[in-house]
Amino acid sequence: MTAMAVSGKLLTALVLSTYILGLALTIQATQYEEDKYQENEVKYGRELASWLAQLAHKNEPAICAHKRNSEIINSLLGLPKLLNDAGRK
């Protein structure tokens, strides 16, 4: 083989190696950017969902005043007695 053929093969191998390395680095950088933007999309998606829920329920009356858990439990436990008393009358 001549020196020209060897240097041509080396040059081809060098160019191909550089291309593959550049391609690998580009793919890695693109994937990092996608992950970064995807985290922001999740954050903004939650904010948008919260805002839409507030907008949808804006004109509805409040469900109830904030009760403590014990008040809710006591009212639920007293419900059968109240129904039983109402049936006797």
UniProtKB/Swiss-Prot annotation:
Residues spanning the membrane: none
Write down any Gene Ontology CC term: extracellular region
Q: Where is the signal peptide?
A: 1-22
The organism's place on the tree of life at top rank: Eukaryota
Q: Which GO terms describe its molecular function?
A: hormone activity
Q: Which residues carry this modification: Alanine amide?
A: 86
Q: Where found?
A: Secreted
Which InterPro entries does the annotation name? Answer: Pigment_DH
User: For this chain's UniProt record, which GO biological process terms are given?
Assistant: response to light stimulus
Q: What keywords sit in the KW lines?
A: Amidation, Cleavage on pair of basic residues, Hormone, Secreted, Signal
**Which function does this protein serve?**
Capable of inducing pigment dispersion in the chromatophores of the fiddler crab Uca pugilator.
Q: Which family does it belong to?
A: Belongs to the arthropod PDH family.
This protein's name: Pigment-dispersing hormone peptides
